[in-house]
């Protein structure tokens, strides 16, 4: 019992299947048994009520024929017998006719005529008590009251014979008396007793006053009682159901036209149940046999359904836990066999998808590591560029300071030339000083040329580094394109996996969640790659800007070198001219003018060089700022690459729980 209760509580598809099959088996047989039972009941009920009505009509017809025959005789005698016959000499003839009639009709106990003068003529003559007055009898009074109509007395027991008789009387045509006969009802009573309705049903007759005339168990003359009397005496004929002594019965009845008596037939309703029970018992036996045979078939069918279902459930549980190597073995070509094959195909598809995802994840992880390494190298290169730019900026500042020094020297030279013009007496001394100053200026110019060449070399190196950075940025862009492709492929594979899982229904729901997570990781990888690509594009644009600025600085430096060369040539000329002053005093004024003009040109050139140096310093500062921004971008790229690597590791951890090889 405990195992059965445990089986009932355990959720299983077999229980609703058993209930459904039993319902399909039991309901039709049960309904058929019920309707067969009801049909047999109704048919038997109709047969019994029809039998009751037929017997009642037959009994009434027998009574009616007998009464009509006797009424005809009474009518005949009431027409032929008159006062003259009763009082005349033909009394003997009348008695002879009475004798003849009673002889021919055994059911007539006596026939007699009574006159107004209280004389009675009867056959057979059994003697009349002295002082007997026939005119005081009910049969006489009723006949006189009805005037020409035959009347029937209440049935009574004949004292002489003990038979139940009824007196039929009618007033003579001339009104001089009444003719009457005693009708023995034994034949009617016997016919009533012979009637059987069903097994225990019977017929009975009552008078208009509810007194029994004929009944198998109740004494004649007993007044009937019960609810049935109200229905019987409220209509001329019909049928109804009633309760008698606590038992259900049915009755059919009719009313005799001549007497108003009630002829009825009744039977117990329980007879219907007794007669219908074999049909019900047969139906129950058929139902039990059907349940046994159907139960065996149902168990076989349910086992054929649940056995492959259990295999499917067990395999689905293993697949949901990550074991994709499990294979369902259902040896059947029906829908379950097809479902098993489809399940195996789904498992194979999942193994293929997981394998591709694992390979893609490994590629993403490898690419992420390469991207991280490239980002680290780029960061180092950017740091070197930043240091080189800072060194270049320091050299440029030193060059600016030296240019200011040169400008100061040129100012002093201009003052010296002015003094030469003012004081010819000190020309020699001034010439010597000018020669020294020219020599010093030449050295400064040569030094400036050296610094400008150094700046030019630094700019070229910076330009080469920036170009290399641009090339590496392009390489990073290519790597990002590869990552984007891998992310798109991973996303596509995740979508395919989700589709396959959706086809699998409930069994693929767990894998659908995994596929959705894989797809989200792929989308995040693609988004991160796009962000990195955007940062790389910004770096490329900034590198291009830096490259353009380096090219501009390189061009300006080259122009500065040309101007410096010109300045060196001018100082050389000054130096040569100052050495010739002592010998060429006559050309002093012209030389002074030339020196003044040359010094002005040199001063202008130095100012130009100073302006160029300042512009170069500003450009270098911009390049330094761009390099710092690039360094920050590379750090972001490195961080994104690390995030992508972490996501790849998470995806690897997720896919590792799936077993795709035996």
Swiss-Prot record:
Residue numbers bearing the Glutamate methyl ester (Gln) modification: 594
Modified residues (Glutamate methyl ester (Glu)): 370, 629, 636
Domain Methyl-accepting transducer stretches: 374-610
Residues in compartment: Cytoplasmic: 1-16, 303-662
InterPro entries assigned: dCache_1, HAMP_dom, MCPsignal_dom, Sensor-like_sf, Tar_rcpt_lig-bd
GO cellular component, one term: plasma membrane
Protein's membrane topology: Multi-pass membrane protein
Residues that span the membrane, as ranges: 17-37, 282-302
Alphabetic keyword roster: Cell membrane, Chemotaxis, Membrane, Methylation, Transducer, Transmembrane, Transmembrane helix
Family annotation (SMART domains): HAMP, MA, TarH
Chain ranges of the HAMP domain: 303-355
Residue ranges, Extracellular side: 38-281
Gene Ontology biological process: chemotaxis; signal transduction
UniProt superkingdom: Bacteria
Compartment(s) where it occurs, according to its Swiss-Prot or TrEMBL record: Cell membrane
Chain ranges of the Cache domain: 153-228
Similarity remark: Belongs to the methyl-accepting chemotaxis (MCP) protein family.
Physiological role: Chemotactic-signal transducers respond to changes in the concentration of attractants and repellents in the environment, transduce a signal from the outside to the inside of the cell, and facilitate sensory adaptation through the variation of the level of methylation. All amino acids serve as attractants in B.subtilis, they appear to cause an increase in the turnover methyl groups, leading to methylation of an unidentified acceptor, while repellents have been shown to cause a decrease in methyl group turnover. The methyl groups are added by a methyltransferase and removed by a methylesterase.
Protein name in the entry: Methyl-accepting chemotaxis protein TlpB
Organism from which the protein derives: Bacillus subtilis (strain 168)
């Amino acid at each position: 019992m405990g195992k059965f209760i445990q089986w009932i509580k355990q959720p299983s598809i077999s229980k609703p299947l058993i209930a459904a099959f039993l319902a399909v088996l039991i309901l039709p047989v049960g309904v058929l048994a019920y309707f067969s039972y009801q049909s047999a009941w109704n048919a038997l009920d109709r047969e019994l009520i029809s039998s009751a009505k037929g017997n009642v009509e037959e009994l009434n017809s027998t009574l009616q024929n007998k009464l009509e025959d006797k009424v005809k005789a009474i009518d005949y005698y009431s027409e032929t017998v008159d006062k003259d016959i009763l009082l005349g000499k033909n009394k003997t003839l009348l008695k002879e006719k009475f004798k003849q009639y009673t002889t021919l009709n055994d059911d007539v106990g006596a026939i007699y005529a009574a006159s107004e003068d209280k004389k009675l003529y009867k056959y057979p003559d059994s003697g009349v008590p002295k002082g007997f007055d026939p005119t005081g009898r009910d049969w006489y009074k009723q006949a006189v009251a009805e005037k020409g109509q035959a009347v029937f007395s209440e049935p009574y027991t004949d004292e002489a014979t003990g038979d139940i008789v009824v007196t039929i009387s009618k007033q003579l045509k001339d009104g001089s008396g009444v003719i009457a006969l005693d009708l023995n009802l034994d034949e009617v009573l016997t016919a009533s007793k012979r009637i059987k309705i069903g097994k225990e049903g019977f017929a009975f007759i009552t008078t208009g006053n509810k007194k029994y005339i004929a009944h198998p168990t109740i004494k004649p003359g007993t007044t009937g009682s019960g609810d049935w009397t109200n229905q019987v005496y409220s209509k001329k004929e019909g049928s109804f159901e009633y309760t008698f002594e606590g038992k259900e019965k049915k009755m059919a009845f009719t009313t005799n036209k001549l007497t108003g008596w009630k002829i009825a037939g009744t039977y117990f309703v329980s007879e219907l149940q007794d007669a219908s029970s074999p049909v019900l018992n047969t139906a129950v036996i058929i139902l039990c046999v059907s349940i046994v045979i159907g139960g065996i078939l149902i168990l076989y069918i349910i086992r054929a359904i649940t056995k492959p279902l259990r295999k499917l459930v067990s395999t689905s549980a293993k697949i949901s836990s990550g074991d994709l190597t499990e294979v369902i073995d259902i040896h059947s070509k029906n829908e379950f066999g097809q479902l098993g094959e489809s399940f195996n195909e789904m498992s194979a598809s999942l193994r293929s998808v997981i394998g591709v995802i694992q390979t893609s994840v490994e590629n993403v992880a490898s690419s992420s590591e390469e991207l991280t390494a490239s980002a680290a190298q780029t960061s180092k290169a950017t740091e070197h560029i930043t240091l080189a730019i800072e060194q270049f900026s320091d050299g440029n500042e030193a060059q600016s300071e030296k240019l200011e020094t040169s400008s100061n020297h040129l100012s002093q030279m201009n003052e010296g030339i002015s003094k030469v013009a003012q004081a010819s007496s000190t020309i020699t001394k001034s010439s010597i000083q000018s020669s020294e100053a020219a020599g010093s200026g030449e050295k400064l110019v040569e030094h400036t040329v050296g610094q400008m060449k150094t700046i030019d070399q630094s700019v070229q190196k910076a330009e080469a580094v920036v170009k290399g950075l641009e090339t590496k940025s392009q390489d990073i862009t290519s790597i990002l394109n590869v990552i984007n492709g891998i992310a798109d492929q991973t996303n596509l594979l995740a979508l395919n996996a989700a589709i396959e899982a959706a086809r699998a229904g409930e069994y693929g729901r767990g894998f659908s969640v995994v596929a959705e997570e894989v797809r989200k990781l792929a989308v995040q990888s693609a988004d991160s790659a796009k962000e990195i690509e955007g940062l790389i594009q910004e770096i490329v644009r900034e590198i291009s800007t830096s490259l353009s600025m380096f090219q501009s600085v390189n061009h300006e430096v080259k122009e500065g070198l040309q101007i410096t060369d010109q300045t060196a040539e001018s100082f050389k000329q000054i130096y040569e001219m100052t050495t010739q002053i002592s010998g060429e005093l006559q050309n002093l004024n012209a030389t002074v003018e030339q020196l003044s003009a040359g010094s002005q040109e040199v001063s202008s050139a130095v100012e130009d060089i100073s302006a160029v140096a300042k512009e170069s310093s500003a450009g270098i500062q911009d390049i330094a700022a761009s390099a710092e921004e690039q360094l920050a971008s590379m750090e972001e790229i490195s961080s994104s690459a690390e995030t992508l690597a972490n996501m790849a590791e998470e995806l690897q951890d997720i896919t590792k729980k799936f077993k795709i090889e035996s």
